[in-house]
Protein backbone atom coordinates (compact mmCIF):
# COMPACT_ATOMS: atom_id res chain seq x y z
CA UNK A 1 0.00 0.00 0.00
CA UNK A 2 1.39 3.41 -1.01
CA UNK A 3 2.38 5.77 1.77
CA UNK A 4 0.10 8.76 2.25
CA UNK A 5 1.65 12.06 1.21
CA UNK A 6 1.70 14.55 4.07
CA UNK A 7 1.83 18.35 4.09
CA UNK A 8 5.32 19.78 4.47
CA UNK A 9 6.30 20.32 8.10
CA UNK A 10 5.36 23.82 9.19
CA UNK A 11 2.98 24.33 6.25
CA UNK A 12 -0.59 23.75 7.34
CA UNK A 13 -3.97 23.12 5.75
CA UNK A 14 -6.80 25.49 6.62
CA UNK A 15 -9.81 23.19 6.98
CA UNK A 16 -13.51 24.06 6.51
CA UNK A 17 -13.98 24.24 10.29
CA UNK A 18 -11.14 26.78 10.52
CA UNK A 19 -11.68 28.91 7.43
CA UNK A 20 -14.68 30.94 8.75
CA UNK A 21 -12.50 32.48 11.48
CA UNK A 22 -9.78 33.21 8.91
CA UNK A 23 -12.39 34.84 6.69
CA UNK A 24 -13.57 36.95 9.61
CA UNK A 25 -10.04 38.22 10.26
CA UNK A 26 -9.35 38.83 6.57
CA UNK A 27 -12.66 40.66 6.12
CA UNK A 28 -11.92 42.90 9.10
CA UNK A 29 -8.48 43.73 7.68
CA UNK A 30 -9.93 44.60 4.26
CA UNK A 31 -12.68 46.69 5.83
CA UNK A 32 -10.26 48.73 7.93
CA UNK A 33 -7.66 49.43 5.22
CA UNK A 34 -10.45 50.37 2.79
CA UNK A 35 -11.87 52.79 5.37
CA UNK A 36 -8.56 54.69 5.20
CA UNK A 37 -8.55 54.83 1.39
CA UNK A 38 -5.65 52.42 0.82
CA UNK A 39 -5.38 50.40 -2.40
CA UNK A 40 -4.54 46.72 -2.80
CA UNK A 41 -1.44 45.55 -4.65
CA UNK A 42 -0.64 41.90 -5.44
CA UNK A 43 2.93 40.72 -5.95
CA UNK A 44 4.45 37.35 -6.94
CA UNK A 45 5.42 34.99 -4.14
CA UNK A 46 8.73 34.26 -5.92
CA UNK A 47 11.33 37.00 -6.43
CA UNK A 48 15.00 37.22 -7.35
CA UNK A 49 17.08 36.26 -4.33
CA UNK A 50 19.13 39.43 -4.70
CA UNK A 51 16.05 41.51 -3.87
CA UNK A 52 15.95 40.21 -0.31
CA UNK A 53 19.73 40.19 0.12
CA UNK A 54 19.85 43.88 -0.75
CA UNK A 55 16.67 44.95 1.03
CA UNK A 56 16.51 42.84 4.19
CA UNK A 57 20.27 42.54 4.77
CA UNK A 58 22.81 39.79 4.11
CA UNK A 59 23.58 39.37 7.81
CA UNK A 60 20.00 39.16 9.08
CA UNK A 61 18.70 35.81 10.27
CA UNK A 62 16.01 35.96 7.57
CA UNK A 63 18.51 36.09 4.70
CA UNK A 64 21.36 34.08 6.21
CA UNK A 65 19.32 31.22 7.70
CA UNK A 66 15.64 31.20 6.86
CA UNK A 67 14.97 31.76 3.15
CA UNK A 68 13.69 29.11 0.74
CA UNK A 69 16.11 29.69 -2.14
CA UNK A 70 16.61 27.63 -5.30
CA UNK A 71 18.07 27.87 -8.80
CA UNK A 72 15.60 27.64 -11.65
CA UNK A 73 16.32 25.88 -14.95
CA UNK A 74 18.08 28.97 -16.28
CA UNK A 75 20.41 29.04 -13.31
CA UNK A 76 18.79 32.13 -11.78
CA UNK A 77 18.61 32.22 -7.98
CA UNK A 78 15.01 32.65 -6.85
CA UNK A 79 13.45 32.84 -3.39
CA UNK A 80 10.00 32.31 -1.93
CA UNK A 81 9.25 35.67 -0.34
CA UNK A 82 10.04 35.75 3.41
CA UNK A 83 8.34 39.14 3.83
CA UNK A 84 6.33 41.57 1.72
CA UNK A 85 7.93 45.01 1.91
CA UNK A 86 10.84 44.31 -0.44
CA UNK A 87 8.53 42.94 -3.14
CA UNK A 88 6.17 45.88 -2.74
CA UNK A 89 9.04 48.35 -3.17
CA UNK A 90 10.30 46.42 -6.19
CA UNK A 91 6.81 46.54 -7.74
CA UNK A 92 6.48 50.28 -7.14
CA UNK A 93 9.86 50.99 -8.74
CA UNK A 94 9.30 48.66 -11.70
CA UNK A 95 5.83 50.07 -12.44
CA UNK A 96 6.76 53.72 -11.78
CA UNK A 97 4.13 54.06 -9.07
CA UNK A 98 6.20 56.34 -6.85
CA UNK A 99 7.65 58.56 -9.56
CA UNK A 100 4.34 60.36 -9.97
CA UNK A 101 2.60 60.50 -6.62
CA UNK A 102 2.42 59.22 -3.08
CA UNK A 103 1.10 55.68 -2.70
CA UNK A 104 -0.87 54.08 0.11
CA UNK A 105 -0.96 50.34 -0.47
CA UNK A 106 -1.87 47.08 1.23
CA UNK A 107 -1.42 43.39 0.40
CA UNK A 108 -2.19 40.02 1.90
CA UNK A 109 -0.78 36.59 1.23
CA UNK A 110 1.59 33.74 2.13
CA UNK A 111 5.24 34.20 3.17
CA UNK A 112 7.88 31.51 3.69
CA UNK A 113 10.70 31.06 6.20
CA UNK A 114 12.61 27.91 7.07
CA UNK A 115 12.22 28.17 10.85
CA UNK A 116 11.60 25.60 13.54
CA UNK A 117 7.82 25.19 13.53
CA UNK A 118 6.04 25.95 16.79
CA UNK A 119 2.82 27.57 17.92
CA UNK A 120 2.56 30.92 16.18
CA UNK A 121 5.64 30.35 14.00
CA UNK A 122 5.35 28.41 10.74
CA UNK A 123 7.28 27.83 7.54
CA UNK A 124 4.39 29.04 5.45
CA UNK A 125 2.55 31.87 7.15
CA UNK A 126 0.27 34.67 6.06
CA UNK A 127 0.74 38.39 6.44
CA UNK A 128 -1.17 41.55 5.75
CA UNK A 129 1.16 44.42 4.97
CA UNK A 130 0.44 48.14 4.62
CA UNK A 131 2.98 50.47 2.99
CA UNK A 132 3.00 54.25 2.41
CA UNK A 133 5.41 55.95 0.00
CA UNK A 134 6.17 59.64 -0.46
CA UNK A 135 5.25 61.04 2.97
CA UNK A 136 7.83 61.89 5.62
CA UNK A 137 5.95 63.34 8.59
CA UNK A 138 5.07 61.63 11.87
CA UNK A 139 1.40 62.08 10.97
CA UNK A 140 1.39 59.12 8.59
CA UNK A 141 3.29 57.01 11.15
CA UNK A 142 0.50 57.84 13.58
CA UNK A 143 -2.19 56.98 11.03
CA UNK A 144 -0.77 53.49 10.53
CA UNK A 145 -0.77 52.91 14.28
CA UNK A 146 -4.33 54.27 14.49
CA UNK A 147 -5.30 51.89 11.68
CA UNK A 148 -3.99 48.88 13.58
CA UNK A 149 -5.71 50.05 16.77
CA UNK A 150 -9.01 50.22 14.86
CA UNK A 151 -8.49 46.67 13.61
CA UNK A 152 -7.91 45.39 17.15
CA UNK A 153 -11.23 46.96 18.17
CA UNK A 154 -12.99 45.39 15.17
CA UNK A 155 -11.68 41.96 16.19
CA UNK A 156 -12.39 42.49 19.89
CA UNK A 157 -8.77 42.05 20.97
CA UNK A 158 -7.91 45.67 21.79
CA UNK A 159 -7.74 44.98 25.54
CA UNK A 160 -5.21 42.19 24.97
CA UNK A 161 -2.50 44.00 23.00
CA UNK A 162 -0.08 46.76 23.93
CA UNK A 163 1.95 49.12 21.78
CA UNK A 164 5.73 49.55 22.08
CA UNK A 165 7.56 52.35 20.24
CA UNK A 166 11.11 53.45 19.64
CA UNK A 167 13.17 55.63 17.36
CA UNK A 168 16.33 54.06 16.01
CA UNK A 169 17.27 57.33 14.32
CA UNK A 170 18.88 57.85 10.95
CA UNK A 171 21.78 55.90 9.48
CA UNK A 172 24.03 58.78 10.53
CA UNK A 173 22.68 58.75 14.10
CA UNK A 174 23.44 55.06 14.42
CA UNK A 175 27.07 55.23 13.31
CA UNK A 176 28.30 56.80 16.55
CA UNK A 177 25.88 54.76 18.63
CA UNK A 178 27.07 51.53 17.03
CA UNK A 179 30.66 52.37 17.99
CA UNK A 180 29.66 53.03 21.60
CA UNK A 181 27.53 49.89 21.80
CA UNK A 182 30.27 47.63 20.41
CA UNK A 183 32.76 49.09 22.90
CA UNK A 184 30.32 48.31 25.73
CA UNK A 185 29.67 44.76 24.50
CA UNK A 186 33.38 44.05 24.19
CA UNK A 187 33.71 44.83 27.90
CA UNK A 188 31.18 42.06 28.58
CA UNK A 189 32.28 39.59 25.93
CA UNK A 190 32.30 36.71 28.41
CA UNK A 191 28.55 37.12 28.97
CA UNK A 192 27.61 37.10 25.28
CA UNK A 193 26.42 33.89 23.66
CA UNK A 194 27.66 32.91 20.20
CA UNK A 195 24.70 34.50 18.44
CA UNK A 196 25.25 37.82 20.22
CA UNK A 197 28.98 37.71 19.44
CA UNK A 198 28.15 37.25 15.76
CA UNK A 199 25.61 40.06 15.83
CA UNK A 200 28.06 42.35 17.63
CA UNK A 201 30.20 42.40 14.47
CA UNK A 202 27.48 42.20 11.81
CA UNK A 203 24.55 44.21 13.22
CA UNK A 204 25.20 45.30 16.84
CA UNK A 205 21.73 46.79 17.35
CA UNK A 206 20.25 43.30 17.04
CA UNK A 207 21.98 42.37 20.31
CA UNK A 208 19.47 44.68 22.01
CA UNK A 209 16.74 42.31 20.84
CA UNK A 210 18.28 39.18 22.40
CA UNK A 211 16.14 36.77 24.41
CA UNK A 212 19.16 35.59 26.45
CA UNK A 213 18.42 36.63 30.08
CA UNK A 214 22.11 36.93 30.98
CA UNK A 215 22.71 39.36 28.12
CA UNK A 216 19.48 41.20 28.88
CA UNK A 217 20.76 41.77 32.42
CA UNK A 218 23.86 43.66 31.27
CA UNK A 219 22.02 45.69 28.63
CA UNK A 220 20.46 47.80 31.36
CA UNK A 221 23.84 49.55 31.60
CA UNK A 222 24.38 49.79 27.83
CA UNK A 223 24.53 53.17 26.07
CA UNK A 224 21.04 54.48 25.28
CA UNK A 225 20.25 55.01 21.62
CA UNK A 226 18.05 58.00 22.47
CA UNK A 227 21.16 59.88 23.61
CA UNK A 228 22.67 59.58 20.12
CA UNK A 229 19.66 60.71 18.08
CA UNK A 230 19.99 63.82 15.92
CA UNK A 231 17.59 66.73 16.34
CA UNK A 232 15.50 65.74 13.31
CA UNK A 233 14.99 62.19 14.61
CA UNK A 234 14.09 63.51 18.07
CA UNK A 235 11.52 65.93 16.66
CA UNK A 236 9.98 63.24 14.46
CA UNK A 237 9.57 60.86 17.38
CA UNK A 238 8.24 63.58 19.67
CA UNK A 239 5.71 64.50 16.99
CA UNK A 240 4.55 60.90 16.74
CA UNK A 241 4.14 60.57 20.50
CA UNK A 242 2.21 63.85 20.63
CA UNK A 243 -0.21 62.64 17.95
CA UNK A 244 -0.78 59.32 19.70
CA UNK A 245 -1.40 61.13 22.98
CA UNK A 246 -3.93 63.36 21.24
CA UNK A 247 -5.98 60.43 19.93
CA UNK A 248 -5.75 58.46 23.16
CA UNK A 249 -3.58 55.56 22.02
CA UNK A 250 -1.47 54.29 24.90
CA UNK A 251 2.11 53.22 24.25
CA UNK A 252 5.35 52.37 25.98
CA UNK A 253 8.73 53.58 24.74
CA UNK A 254 11.05 50.57 24.55
CA UNK A 255 14.61 51.64 23.78
CA UNK A 256 15.63 48.05 23.03
CA UNK A 257 13.07 47.72 20.25
CA UNK A 258 15.02 47.60 16.97
CA UNK A 259 13.13 45.14 14.71
CA UNK A 260 14.89 42.34 12.84
CA UNK A 261 15.33 43.78 9.34
CA UNK A 262 18.10 46.13 8.27
CA UNK A 263 16.01 48.61 6.28
CA UNK A 264 14.33 50.36 9.24
CA UNK A 265 15.13 53.90 10.40
CA UNK A 266 13.56 56.40 12.79
CA UNK A 267 10.15 55.06 13.92
CA UNK A 268 9.80 51.38 14.81
CA UNK A 269 6.82 49.87 16.61
CA UNK A 270 5.32 46.55 17.67
CA UNK A 271 1.95 45.44 18.99
CA UNK A 272 2.49 42.70 21.58
CA UNK A 273 0.18 40.29 23.38
CA UNK A 274 0.67 38.08 26.42
CA UNK A 275 -1.93 35.61 25.10
CA UNK A 276 0.44 33.64 22.82
CA UNK A 277 3.42 32.89 25.03
CA UNK A 278 6.81 33.38 23.37
CA UNK A 279 5.35 34.44 20.02
CA UNK A 280 3.91 37.65 21.40
CA UNK A 281 4.40 40.06 18.49
CA UNK A 282 1.25 40.25 16.36
CA UNK A 283 2.19 43.32 14.31
CA UNK A 284 5.35 45.28 13.67
CA UNK A 285 6.57 48.05 11.43
CA UNK A 286 8.34 51.34 11.05
CA UNK A 287 10.03 53.70 8.64
CA UNK A 288 12.36 52.65 5.84
CA UNK A 289 13.19 55.94 4.15
CA UNK A 290 16.30 54.64 2.37
CA UNK A 291 14.99 51.37 0.93
CA UNK A 292 13.51 52.66 -2.34
CA UNK A 293 16.80 54.31 -3.31
CA UNK A 294 18.73 51.26 -2.11
CA UNK A 295 16.76 49.12 -4.58
CA UNK A 296 17.32 51.46 -7.53
CA UNK A 297 14.48 53.97 -7.25
CA UNK A 298 14.63 57.65 -6.49
CA UNK A 299 14.97 58.68 -2.84
CA UNK A 300 11.50 58.22 -1.33
CA UNK A 301 10.27 58.35 2.25
CA UNK A 302 8.36 55.24 3.27
CA UNK A 303 6.71 53.64 6.28
CA UNK A 304 4.71 50.46 6.78
CA UNK A 305 3.79 47.51 8.93
CA UNK A 306 2.97 43.82 8.66
CA UNK A 307 0.81 41.59 10.82
CA UNK A 308 0.75 37.81 11.06
CA UNK A 309 -2.70 36.39 10.36
CA UNK A 310 -1.95 33.03 12.01
CA UNK A 311 -1.16 34.81 15.26
CA UNK A 312 -4.35 36.86 15.08
CA UNK A 313 -6.39 33.70 14.49
CA UNK A 314 -4.58 31.91 17.34
CA UNK A 315 -5.17 34.86 19.61
CA UNK A 316 -8.88 34.93 18.87
CA UNK A 317 -9.10 31.20 19.51
CA UNK A 318 -7.23 31.60 22.80
CA UNK A 319 -9.58 34.39 23.86
CA UNK A 320 -12.60 32.36 22.64
CA UNK A 321 -13.58 35.07 20.15
CA UNK A 322 -14.50 32.45 17.58
CA UNK A 323 -18.12 33.30 16.82
CA UNK A 324 -18.49 33.52 13.05
CA UNK A 325 -21.32 33.74 10.61
CA UNK A 326 -22.77 30.35 9.74
CA UNK A 327 -21.87 28.99 6.32
CA UNK A 328 -25.46 27.91 5.48
CA UNK A 329 -28.69 29.80 6.20
CA UNK A 330 -31.22 27.72 4.28
CA UNK A 331 -31.23 23.99 3.52
CA UNK A 332 -33.37 22.69 0.65
CA UNK A 333 -35.08 19.39 1.56
CA UNK A 334 -36.63 17.62 -1.43
CA UNK A 335 -38.08 14.17 -2.01
CA UNK A 336 -40.22 12.87 -4.84
CA UNK A 337 -40.35 13.08 -8.62
CA UNK A 338 -39.55 16.50 -10.03
CA UNK A 339 -38.58 17.97 -6.69
CA UNK A 340 -34.83 18.14 -7.23
CA UNK A 341 -34.92 20.55 -10.17
CA UNK A 342 -37.69 22.55 -8.47
CA UNK A 343 -35.52 22.83 -5.36
CA UNK A 344 -32.53 24.04 -7.36
CA UNK A 345 -34.70 26.64 -9.10
CA UNK A 346 -36.14 27.86 -5.80
CA UNK A 347 -32.65 28.05 -4.27
CA UNK A 348 -31.48 30.23 -7.15
CA UNK A 349 -34.57 32.42 -6.77
CA UNK A 350 -33.62 33.01 -3.13
CA UNK A 351 -30.01 33.80 -4.02
CA UNK A 352 -31.28 36.37 -6.52
CA UNK A 353 -33.73 38.09 -4.17
CA UNK A 354 -32.39 37.77 -0.59
CA UNK A 355 -29.11 39.66 -0.22
CA UNK A 356 -26.28 37.55 1.17
CA UNK A 357 -28.39 34.44 1.76
CA UNK A 358 -26.53 31.12 1.74
CA UNK A 359 -28.60 28.23 0.41
CA UNK A 360 -27.50 24.60 0.23
CA UNK A 361 -29.36 22.00 -1.81
CA UNK A 362 -29.50 18.41 -0.63
CA UNK A 363 -28.09 15.92 -3.12
CA UNK A 364 -27.70 12.16 -2.97
CA UNK A 365 -31.22 11.12 -2.02
CA UNK A 366 -32.38 9.96 1.38
CA UNK A 367 -35.57 10.35 3.38
CA UNK A 368 -36.69 13.52 5.16
CA UNK A 369 -35.14 12.45 8.47
CA UNK A 370 -31.71 12.08 6.87
CA UNK A 371 -32.04 15.43 5.11
CA UNK A 372 -33.09 17.30 8.27
CA UNK A 373 -30.17 15.74 10.11
CA UNK A 374 -27.88 17.11 7.43
CA UNK A 375 -29.51 20.55 7.73
CA UNK A 376 -28.75 20.57 11.46
CA UNK A 377 -25.18 19.45 10.86
CA UNK A 378 -24.39 22.32 8.48
CA UNK A 379 -25.95 24.84 10.88
CA UNK A 380 -28.89 25.99 8.77
CA UNK A 381 -31.58 28.01 10.54
CA UNK A 382 -34.30 27.43 7.93
CA UNK A 383 -35.32 24.30 6.03
CA UNK A 384 -37.46 24.54 2.91
CA UNK A 385 -39.29 21.29 2.15
CA UNK A 386 -40.45 20.37 -1.33
CA UNK A 387 -42.49 17.28 -2.04
CA UNK A 388 -44.51 16.41 -5.12
CA UNK A 389 -47.61 18.17 -3.72
CA UNK A 390 -45.69 21.38 -3.04
CA UNK A 391 -44.24 21.37 -6.55
CA UNK A 392 -47.73 20.92 -8.02
CA UNK A 393 -49.21 23.70 -5.85
CA UNK A 394 -46.24 26.07 -6.27
CA UNK A 395 -45.81 26.13 -2.49
CA UNK A 396 -43.09 25.15 -0.04
CA UNK A 397 -43.02 24.09 3.61
CA UNK A 398 -40.88 26.54 5.58
CA UNK A 399 -39.50 25.21 8.88
CA UNK A 400 -37.77 27.41 11.43
CA UNK A 401 -35.00 25.11 12.69
CA UNK A 402 -34.37 27.35 15.71
CA UNK A 403 -37.90 27.94 16.95
CA UNK A 404 -39.40 24.73 15.57
CA UNK A 405 -42.45 26.30 13.88
CA UNK A 406 -43.35 25.42 10.32
CA UNK A 407 -45.79 26.77 7.76
CA UNK A 408 -46.74 26.24 4.15
CA UNK A 409 -46.22 29.36 2.03
CA UNK A 410 -46.43 30.31 -1.61
CA UNK A 411 -43.12 30.24 -3.45
CA UNK A 412 -43.73 33.88 -4.40
CA UNK A 413 -43.56 34.97 -0.75
CA UNK A 414 -40.92 32.58 0.54
CA UNK A 415 -38.09 35.09 0.00
CA UNK A 416 -39.71 37.60 2.37
CA UNK A 417 -40.27 34.90 5.00
CA UNK A 418 -36.69 33.63 4.76
CA UNK A 419 -35.24 37.14 4.98
CA UNK A 420 -37.11 37.67 8.24
CA UNK A 421 -35.66 34.51 9.81
CA UNK A 422 -31.97 34.61 8.90
Curated annotation (Swiss-Prot):
Catalysed reactions, as listed in the record: tRNA(His) + L-histidine + ATP = L-histidyl-tRNA(His) + AMP + diphosphate + H(+)
Stretches that traverse the bilayer: none
UniProt subcellular location: Cytoplasm
Record InterPro entries: aa-tRNA-synth_II, aa-tRNA-synth_II/BPL/LPL, Anticodon-bd, Anticodon-bd_dom_sf, His-tRNA-ligase, HisRS-like_core, HisRS/HisZ, HisRS_anticodon
Annotated PROSITE patterns: AA_TRNA_LIGASE_II
Cellular component aspect of the GO annotation: cytoplasm
Group of enzyme by EC: ligase
EC code(s) of this entry: 6.1.1.21
Keyword GTP-binding: no
Keyword annotations from UniProtKB, A to Z: Aminoacyl-tRNA synthetase, ATP-binding, Cytoplasm, Ligase, Nucleotide-binding, Protein biosynthesis
Protein's GO biological process: histidyl-tRNA aminoacylation
Family label: Belongs to the class-II aminoacyl-tRNA synthetase family.
NCBIfam families per UniProt: hisS
Record note on quaternary structure: Homodimer.
PANTHER family: HISTIDINE--TRNA LIGASE, MITOCHONDRIAL-RELATED (PTHR43707:SF1), HISTIDYL-TRNA SYNTHETASE (PTHR43707)
Full protein name: Histidine--tRNA ligase
Amino acid sequence: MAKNIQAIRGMNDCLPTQSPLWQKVESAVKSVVSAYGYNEVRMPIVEETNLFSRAVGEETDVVSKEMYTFDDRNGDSLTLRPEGTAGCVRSCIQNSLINRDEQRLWYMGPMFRHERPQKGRYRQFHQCGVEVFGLDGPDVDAELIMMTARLWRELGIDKHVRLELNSIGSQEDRVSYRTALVAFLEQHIDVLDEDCKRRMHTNPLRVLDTKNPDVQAILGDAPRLSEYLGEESKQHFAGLCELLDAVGIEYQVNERLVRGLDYYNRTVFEWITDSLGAQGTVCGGGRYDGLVEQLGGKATNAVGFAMGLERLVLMMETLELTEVRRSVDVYMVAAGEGTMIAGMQLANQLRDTVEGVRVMNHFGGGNFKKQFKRADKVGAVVALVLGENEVADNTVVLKDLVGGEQQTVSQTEVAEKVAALI
